[in-house]
A protein has these predicted regions:
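Active-site and ligand/interface coordination hotspots across diverse enzymes
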Residues: 1-64, 203, 208-260
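A conditional alpha-helix N-cap/helix-loop micro-motif detector
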Residues: 26, 66, 104-108
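Short linear loop/turn motifs
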Residues: 32, 85-87
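Glycine-rich, small/polar surface segments that engage phosphate groups of diverse ligands
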Residues: 53-83
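Glycine/proline-rich loop-helix segments at beta-alpha junctions forming the active-site rim
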Residues: 76, 80-81, 88-260
Length: 260
């Protein structure tokens, strides 16, 4: 899918979100907030739901939590324009309460379709309700800063999910803010791990001799629309959050990537 095709598909979904009446939240919203960002990105950030400022402007993460997210991205040399940002629910829950299970379920098809279009390498969850969509049963106090393969049923067919605290929690608790900077510093390395994992999956046997193409050959194949994400060149050091991800071309078993 080309960049233009992705953008067009995302705009169709956004139009459906703005007209949505699938749950009670449409009765109290000012604007629905479909999400925004680079349609060719490799990294998608998924928050919990819009707040007051987002409801007013129709854009995700534009309040104080959004300002912190921009600073977190800047700490690794990224801009919010480099990624795609959305939420598990697209309308503001009244009084900024937690989204209810049926509200999350009502929005699930929109998020799944967005991820199918974007086909990200990494999904970064922000907060426990977002994390619960991709890491059922995990506790954010244990899971933040770690990753695991995404269930293809979520729409991200071949991605890794990386858990973080919500920026709003970081604003309330200095210790969580410090941990959030530590966590986001690992996201570029998670991106490399996902790229290597995808390259290994894409190797195909040659019919004549049964030879399998190496990762290097896959990695250097022309990309009609390179995605502008920066990631460290070096392989992860021993002891890092993804120390079980080897630098070799072999496919990493998914159980080795489940780190908690």
């Amino acid at each position: 899918m080309t960049r233009a095709e992705r953008q067009a598909a995302l705009e169709v979904i956004a139009g459906e979100v703005r007209a949505c009446t699938r749950c009670r939240l449409h009765t109290t919203r000012t604007q629905a907030v479909p999400g925004e960002g680079d349609p060719s990105t490799e990294v998608v950030f998924v928050g919990e739901g819009p707040g007051m400022n987002e409801d007013r402007l129709g854009r995700p993460f534009v309040g104080r939590a959004g300002d912190l997210l921009v600073r977190l991205l800047g700490s690794i040399g990224w801009r919010r324009e480099d990624v795609f940002i959305t939420n598990v629910v697209k309308c503001r829950p009244p009084d900024n309460r937690d989204p209810e299970a049926d509200e999350i379920a009502a929005c699930e098809p929109y998020l799944r379709r967005q991820l199918e279009v974007l086909d990200p390498a990494v999904v970064v969850t922000l907060g426990r309700h977002s994390m619960g969509r991709f890491m059922p049963g995990a506790r954010i106090s244990h899971a933040h800063g770690t990753m695991r393969p995404v269930d293809p049923a979520t729409g991200a067919a071949d991605a890794l999910v990386f858990a973080m605290y919500h920026p709003a929690a970081a604003l309330r608790t200095p210790a969580i803010e410090r941990e959030s900077y530590d966590d986001i510093a690992r996201v570029p390395t998670a991106l490399i791990a996902s790229r290597e994992r995808r390259a290994a999956r894409e190797r195909t046997p040659v019919a004549a001799g049964g030879v399998t193409a190496g990762t290097a050959a896959v990695a250097t194949a022309p990309d009609p629309e390179p995605k502008p994400m920066r990631a460290p060149e070096a392989s992860p050091e021993p002891g890092s959050v993804i120390e079980s991800q080897p630098a070799s071309a072999d496919l990493v078993p998914t159980d080795q990537l489940t780190l908690f």
